[in-house]
Amino acid sequence: MATKKSGGSSCNGRDSRGRRLGVKKFGSELVIPGNIIIRQRGTKYHPGKNVGIGRDHTIFSKIAGVVSFRRKAEGRVFVDVLPESVSASLS
């Protein structure tokens, strides 16, 4: 017979890793086609000009240019990619 009782097993002690969501390219950053701009759950940010939205609501660039964020009157935030020639004339 053992003189020491065995320790019990625990049901706790595990957790899942974070999902690495959020803005990956900020306003006025240069992007190329296919660059991920935002990873999100749901449409916190909406796709604007020259960007696409993936099946998991990831917003990505369709053209080379500069990232721009704009807010509409109803409160929605849209993400655009402006061509470099247009963004140069704005600044």
Swiss-Prot record:
It holds the Pfam family Ribosomal_L27. GO terms for biological process: translation. Keywords: Ribonucleoprotein, Ribosomal protein. Residues 1-20 are annotated as: Disordered. GO terms for molecular function: structural constituent of ribosome. One of its GO terms (cellular component) is cytosolic large ribosomal subunit. Residues 1-13 have a biased composition (Polar residues). Signal peptide: none annotated. Belongs to the bacterial ribosomal protein bL27 family. NCBIfam families: L27 (TIGR00062). HAMAP family: Ribosomal_bL27. PANTHER family: LARGE RIBOSOMAL SUBUNIT PROTEIN BL27M (PTHR15893:SF0), RIBOSOMAL PROTEIN L27 (PTHR15893). This is Large ribosomal subunit protein bL27.
